[in-house]
Amino acid sequence: MLPGASIPVVIVADGDEGPAFATVHAGWRGMIAGVAGMAAAELAKGRRLVAAAVGPSIGPCCFAVDEELRRRFEARFPGSAGAETVDLWRCARLDLEAAGVPPGAISVAGRCTASDGRFFSHRRDAGATGRHLGFGVRI
């Protein structure tokens, strides 16, 4: 997975055939569409959802949106929108919980790629960025 400003999500499940995982790359459009929850629901077929992790991405401090987009997020994920920003981490958490991931088993990195200079950020650096690499390995 090569997320830019998008939200990287890893979902883990277990079942009779052994453990399985999914990686999800969710931009704001995918987040509103419920891509994290849809992936979790698909992974849960015949399995039990065990955990999920939300990796570094643009944080609620920096994801400024216009009023129309703020309203769309608030309608889809109550409590996710501030006066001028949206908390995509909260959106991911709510989507995963709704799909059946136990709330206590969802880990959010809490690292904002826009405000933390150790990460690339399209918004912060006006498009002059690289990519982050994320991968999962089943052992």
PLM features: what roles do these ranges have?
Residues M1-I139:
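Active-site microenvironment for binding and transforming phosphate-containing groups
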